Amino acid sequence: MRLHHLGPDFPEALVDELLEGNVVFLCGAGVSAPQLPNFRDLVLNVYNRLGEERTPAEDHAFQASRYEEVLGALSRRLVRSEDVIDAAAAELQVPANPDTAHHDVILRLSRDQVGRPIIVTTNFDTLFERSLMVSHSAAFATQESAAGQDIPAPGSARFTGVVHTHGRLTDDELNLSQTELVLTSAQYGEAYLRAGWAARFLFDLMRCRTLVLVGYTANDAPVRYILNVLEGDRERFTDLRRVYALSSSNGDPQAAAAPWQALAVEPLLFDPEGGNPYGPLWSSLEGLANLVENPDVRRREMIAAIVSGPVSETTDHDIRTLKWALGARADLFEHFITRCEDAAWFDTLAVVIRAFGERARAWMLARWFARGWDDKVRYLTAIKHLGRGSQEFSDAVFRELDQNRPQDAIWEKAWRLLAEAAAAASHDSLRDYQLRHRLNRGPVVESDLGHLVNAIGPRLTIEAPFRDEDPSEHPNQLSDIARFSMESEHQEFLRDVLASPAGNAENILRLLERGSQRLSCQLRTARDAELIGQVRDVTDFGVPSVVNHQQNQHRRGFVPLTVFITSALPMAAQANLEGTKRVVGGWRAEPFNLTTRLWMHALTHQALFTADEAIEALATSNEAAFWSFALEFVAIVRARIAQASGEAVERLVRRLLVEGPQRYADREQNADGIDWQDRARDRDIWVRLTAISEHVVLPQEAETLLHEIRERRTYLSREIDERDLFRTWSSGVRAVRGRTAQIVSAQPSERLTIADRLEESSDIEDREGWVEYCREDPVGAYAALRSHPLEIGVVARWATWLEIIPSRANMTSPEWLRVIQEAVELLGEADDEIVIALVGPLARIAEHSRQLQLALPANWWDRLWQAAEGEPDVDWGDDVETYDRVINSTGGSLAEALLQAISSQRENGDDVNAADFQRLQRMIVSMTYSGEMARAACVRYLSFVFSVSNEIALDHLRPFIAADNDEGRRLRGVLVEYNSFVADTEISFADLILQGVRESRQKDVSAANAASHLVRAVVASFDEPNVVRGISPQQARQTLREAAADIRVGALKIMTNWLEENPDDERAAAWTDLYGPTFQAIWPRDRSYLSNDVSKEVFSLATAAGTAFEAAVEALLPYVSTFEDDWLSLHDLERNNAELATRFPVAALRLVWAACGPPCKGRTSDIAAILDAVAAANPALAVDRRMHKLRLLAVSH
């Protein structure tokens, strides 16, 4: 918390301690400056006052800033040693009109829990008492002053006022006498060492108060004595409080902090201000005093100042301050809500808000929404929080809506639907599985039937508009605000629930009733959400079939519920016919398409309706039922019309003949002249009359009409196809595979022409025809290519064919190999224009020439490289790794081809061709995009390149790797992330390897690869101590210190993986001889390098040591910090039936306790087996209290 732009950044923990009255300021001479001298000036003034000169010994101590030793030496050589004390007392007398502004501020800050001032000072002067005299009275100041060995014990009732640990001077105005002073080295030794009363006082003080040093430098004598005493105690006593020091940065914060950090003090640095170097300190302390005295006022000011602006314009310091201001103060969130405009603050403060519980979070959000019901940003924020939906959130929004209704009706509806959606979103899948278990076990209770249909049925879902659909400023309908839909979960575990006891005769009717009620309720919600309107019904359109059908696959929404209802229908009719008819009658009475379709489906069941009843009901149904639902219409006809009476059939056909020709008569013709009304009318009549004609003879009039339609629409002159009954038809998901029939059936000379024509097709499979043909018959495709002259117009066809050659490297048929060789020779003679156009695929063929057994033309590489150098740069973006770019580039492929050619020469025992040396050098120094890619490929195989020519590697390639530019950094990344080095290469490139490791920001496997160079070098130094390596253990350790955290974690992973590669019976020796020493040699010992990720990897490393597990635990335990994850993985110790815990129970318990002991709050399913193994192997440990605490983390599944 920074209260001045140049002032110290006060930790929030310190501010909290100040508010609790748990902080004591320990004040030095700087507090009284410049009125009184500091220790250095005091020494100079004492010498002047006494008329003495410093001896060489005294001057040596003076130059070392050991002023207490200077005065000690002086007092020893004076005849009257008291002269030193008297001279110092004279120099430190309080001025006639003292300025106590600094002391006033500190007295406001340094107070106990009940507000009494408590200051500890090593100053002899009484300026603090003078400040108390002004603020209280002279008597109070006198009473509250204590000095020397009469100081009160910290924490006691008397521990108040001004405590002079080094003594106090006389103050006649306050009637205070002088006490023994601690000024010389001998007196310091007495107070802190021989008698030790000052040391005991400070130790007790540190156990009950946080200490803030002000007015000192790190080299001041009081600081050195005090903190050396405390540091010794801190190693043995864990309850010592923190020590802070207020100090100037002097323009170099790092250098200023170092001396304090060496004394285990947290420095709070301020920057000096021109003309008033200490102004920022005292201004900050005054601001801190104002905060401590009026915390609520200051909290409110901070909140208002910070949240009135957007999160994007705030600093980390601002956010930290805001979190402190709001922390543990739910009453201030109303203040936050009234001033917050940026929704991002809720994400920024998510952890703080969550600490108050779900109910408070919901209230905060709802209150903020209510301040701007018609604000689209607030609504979109609410949508984001729907994912964490809860009943509390729903209740809070409804409550605000009731108390403060939106002015706009559309917005009110949107918010009410959102509140409803929030309640539905709180659905818990785990409860569904528990429900299934209860339903299978029985008996089934009524509430579980309700839970079942609720789980199957859809719920309202609200999503933000697509990115290119910003919400309207003045919405006229809900879709202007957000995307509303009805969605259901994938409830596969409930698919066959009707076969469980829930589907028994005594339950099935209630299930049907509850399902129908749920359907009706959710349809009304959908209507409220404007998903059902006069013209459009999204719910109906989203259900291809109300019965189980392939077209329902991948559909959600209302599909599961409607299929569940139709599946339960025949079972319910068998169990209770009259009750089922009553439910079906309810469907017909509902004003929804889906319920109408369910009623129509019920007409197909003989148990519910006679054939005449079904056909009569269909004939007299409303317009939507009769004309809109072809699938259900045809299903009724096919199931019932054959058994129906002639009269019933006649009435049905008559309605078709009367109403059919009038369909769409009121619709206007399209402007484009397409007679869609006539076509749609013909199709509606055709599908219905055709379905009827399948089972009965149509009347002549109907037959004539059907014939006319078939004549008019020749595409309808057929039987009904199933897809005719659906408004949309899905053919399923399938891979796109080029269609080659037309190409294959043509003559070779015609195939390219056909391929060109197919490429213009609207069918993607036609467009992919040539590509697929090249894959299916590459020899035939080559024949087609050869039938045309090698010209620029056919280059695209050649490119496609050439690109498939590398993927056919395993084809060994003589014909195929002949064709490739012939193609290479042909293209080797091609014009430069052709080579340039085909350089990419040709380079990849060169790269795979060995596998393809190709004899490349002598000038092949040179021509391709010349063409490659003309290629433009490729913008890959920041997401593509450097080496991924290389392997997909022409330059990278040609580099690989050249290196392979050189390797073949060496494998055959030949000297490397001089021309290839020249090519390698030419490629490396090329300042083109292809040159950059080729250099990266050479860096990937640096050890090989170095072995071929260390001159080329060092003189030409190394400068590019060492360059301080983007390419240099990318090359160093390839160097360390994709390589392993022999000793000679490591020695020559050690500095760049270390730099690459320091620069790497990779994670996971790539980070481990980078770290492996450090580990490999040090392991090798222990394995083969006589072999010189390029990276020493000291360099490896320093590099790990400077590298990213992921690199350090990667180093541990590499050690674990390599250790586990050893056979089980060799792991102990590998740990003892290699990996244990390597860890001790390279791992930083600073506590600052401990982390949760490090701790987890150290845990795994210990378990990889095999029978050396005890020794590994002993060595690694200091580096295991408490795990911080919510879910803990102890599998490395639990595997193989907790074998290590059985063999080494004490070590296993120590390791698990270090990782999972307090304050760990995670849970794990691994720990029970480990603890059981420990207890079984060593029964005495069963009563160990660590075991009891660790068992609290166990989770059983």
UniProtKB/Swiss-Prot annotation:
SUPFAM superfamilies on file: DHS-like NAD/FAD-binding domain
Pfam families, sorted: SIR2_2
InterPro entries linked to this entry: DHS-like_NAD/FAD-binding_dom
Keywords of this entry: Plasmid
Name the record gives this protein: Uncharacterized protein y4cA
Species the sequence originates in: Sinorhizobium fredii (strain NBRC 101917 / NGR234)
